Amino acid sequence: MDEPEDRGTAFIFADGAGAFLLGPANEPGVGPTVWGADGSEFNTIVVAPNWLEIRDTCAADGEFVWPTLHMEGQKVFKWAVSSMVGVCYQALEAAGVTPDDIQLFVPHQANNRITDALVRGLKFPESVIVARDIVMTGNTSAASIPLALDGLVNDGLAKSGDLALMVGFGAGLAYAAQVVRIP
């Protein structure tokens, strides 16, 4: 899906898959989800041409053009750093906790500059462990949060009972944040 010549996407994105398995627990461990979308910026991350355009082009002249990802990285960066801190605070409030109660911060692994800006904006104590596996895995889109948390668990940095704030965002521009307790 990446255009190999597009320096804004080709070297950032990686392949990955992740999932969270939930089961019964004696105490609630998954906080409320804060989610939404900012449709005013829908065109900052797009796949083009879209499938309707491909269908119409193929019907008209028989040519098939494979769609590729296009991203306005600076716009996404500015939107993420100006919007996601507020979304994180909403998730903390919905869970009834503060930044001081959090042990782990697991943001979408878009890039380290966004993560740095979010950490500064949330004013976490120094003890909060911040997932930064983008340097090893790249931006694996929706898989980045499960993979980053798995890395923290495997490295012994995430402990049972820790509270983790997770926040993700992507095309649309859609977003979600939630506080979870590590089992």
Regions of interest found by a model, annotated:
Residues 81, 85, 92, 103-183:
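Claisen-condensing/thiolase-fold acyl-transfer catalytic domains that form or cleave C-C bonds
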Residues 96-101:
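Short, surface-exposed connector motifs at secondary-structure boundaries
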Residues 60-67, 90-94, 122-126:
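Short amphipathic alpha-helical segments, especially helix-boundary/capping motifs
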Residues 5-78, 82, 86, 169, ...:
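Condensing-enzyme catalytic core mediating Claisen C-C bond formation in acyl metabolism
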Residues 1-4, 27-28, 59, 87-89, ...:
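Short amphipathic alpha-helical surface micro-motifs
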